[in-house]
Amino acid sequence: MESSVDEEALHQLYLWVDNIPLSRPKRNLSRDFSDGVLVAELIKFYFPKMVEMHNYVPANSLQQKLSNWGHLNRKVLNKLNFSVPDDVMRKIAQCSPGVVELVLIPLRQRLEERQRRQKLGVGSLQELAPQDSSGYMDMGLPQKVRGEGAPALGEQLREGRPLASRPPGYNQALQGDPSFVLQIAEKEQELLASQETVQVLQMKVKRLEHLLQLKNVRIDDLSRRLQQAERKQR
């Protein structure tokens, strides 16, 4: 699968994330950001008073992840005139490869724009909103970042063309041959499949061990009865 956003945009995104101190080790962007906690931390890094971290619970369950994202959308992103649609939140919570990048790229732009305006002491939040009142899905990368002919982010997601999953040390995979990125993504998928296979085999082993224990109990019981019968015959 080819990357839908040009490599330079991704390169800049991973550098940005790598340079912000986060509470978790950076391993896999799709999984790391799936529960919304690290997104809240990114925003808090820029605007500490805007985010109360106790509202965001590290989660593995889909329900809690969606709860975190819903709260983030209503209480924080709304203040930035930024919104993540429900279907996109669900894809992020499900760790769909490449989807969270489509949120982080425009979110970074929004955060840095607001920070610049605050430093200059001009502009209100309303000035940060798109002129046509369009939402997140209609926001794209500036042409300079996207490169000539690159599609808008919202269009990419609508057409079902997510980015490839990225390996640990987000920016590292972009060094050297771009085909390395695809190879890493494929290896990650193979690893996940292997882990699932191992889990299934472990369950089978436990089941067989349980059956063996039952058989041993049965054998012991029969042996005891046989011994009792032999003693009676004597």
Curated annotation (Swiss-Prot):
A Gene Ontology term for the protein's cellular component: axoneme
Keywords: Actin-binding, Cell membrane, Cell projection, Cilium, Cilium biogenesis/degradation, Cytoplasm, Cytoskeleton, Flagellum, Membrane, Microtubule
Domain notes: The Calponin-homology domain mediates its binding to microtubules.
Matching InterPro entries: CH_2, CH_dom, CH_dom_sf, Spermatogenesis_Ciliary_MAP
Any one GO molecular function term: microtubule binding
Single GO BP term: lamellipodium assembly
Entry function: Microtubule-associated protein that promotes microtubule bundling and stabilizes microtubules against depolymerization in response to cold shock. Microtubule-associated protein involved in the stabilization of microtubules along the axis of migration during radial intercalation. Promotes the establishment and stabilization of an axis of microtubules required for the active migration of cells into the outer epithelium.
Localization terms from the record: Cytoplasm; Cell projection, Cilium, Flagellum; Cytoplasm, Cytoskeleton, Cilium axoneme; Apical cell membrane
Region annotated Essential for homodimerization and microtubule bundling activity, chain positions: 181-234
Taxonomic placement: Eukaryota, Metazoa, Chordata, Craniata, Vertebrata
Tissues with expression: Expressed predominantly in the seminiferous epithelium of adult testis. Expressed in pillar cells of the organ of Corti (at protein level). Expressed in brain, kidney, lung and testis. Highly expressed in the trachea, lung and oviduct.
Subunit description: Homodimer. Interacts with actin, TJP1, CGN and CDH1.
PROSITE patterns given in the database record: CH
Protein name per its UniProtKB record: Sperm flagellar protein 1
Gene disruption: observed consequences: Depletion in ependymal cells by RNAi completely abolishes the central pair microtubules and markedly attenuates ciliary localizations of HYDIN and SPAG6, resulting in rotational beat of the ependymal cilia.
Other remarks on this protein: Radial intercalation is a developmentally reiterated form of migration by which cells move in a direction orthogonal to the plane of the tissue from an inner layer to an outer layer.
All residue ranges annotated as the Calponin-homology (CH) domain in the record: 7-112
UniProt-listed Pfam families: CH_2
